[in-house]
Amino acid sequence: FTGKLVGTIKTVLGTAAIGKMISDSVNAGGALQQSLGGIETLFKDIADKVKTYAAQAYKTAGLSANDYMESTTSFAASLLSSVSQDTDAAAQLANMAMVDMSDNANKMGASMQDIQNAYQGFAKQNYTMLDNLKLGYGGTQAEMQRLLKDAEKISGVKYDLGNLADMYSAIHVIQTELDITGTTAREATTTLTGSFASMKAAAQNVLGQMALGEDLQPS
């Protein structure tokens, strides 16, 4: 009797696990489909480039493709406007920003959500969350201006307040100077926490691809 009971429990648990996997896959697929539509609408002819960045985000930013695209679409319109609708330039800048956000979260110990909120705020010329980045600048317009000036001293490039591409580029310069750039990619291959985040994001990609009927190929 005990053996039968154990077998029944195993069967039930196995069925529940399969059911959860199917449910998770459907949910991930629906979210992924919506994100893909947003990327195609915003980036048009260069959308495939953004999708490639998204597919690699589990390694470069510790994010699933869907999380990467959702965050990118939240500031893409403002970014496109700041580069005169140059979709290729915007795609590259968006990828730089996404990796910078993840690098900051991993190096400085800040919440990824707090950092994403800050970047989305910059797209609306709201600088109150600049201090979320923990780069030594307060959450004011004057402090963002100071960051731009500091970045200019390092790179020799002039950055304009109010231009989103300039702000993201200046933050990248400061983070590179502070040896923050590249943290996520390094941790994905050298630390348990980084490896786990990368594997978790990759697993979410697989669930989404399964639901959309895509080929599951190694990246």
For every predicted segment, state its role:
Residues 84-87:
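Short, solvent-exposed hinge/capping segments at secondary-structure junctions
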Residues 67:
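Secreted/periplasmic proteins that engage bacterial cell-wall peptidoglycan
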Residues 2-6:
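Alpha-helical membrane-interface segments at transmembrane helix boundaries
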Residues 63, 110:
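Short glycine/serine/threonine/alanine-rich loop segments
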Residues 181, 185-188, 192, 199:
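Alpha-helical heptad-repeat coiled-coil segments that mediate oligomerization/polymerization in large
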Residues 7-61, 72-82, 93-105, 114-160, ...:
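Small-residue helix-packing and pore-constriction motifs in hydrophobic alpha-helices
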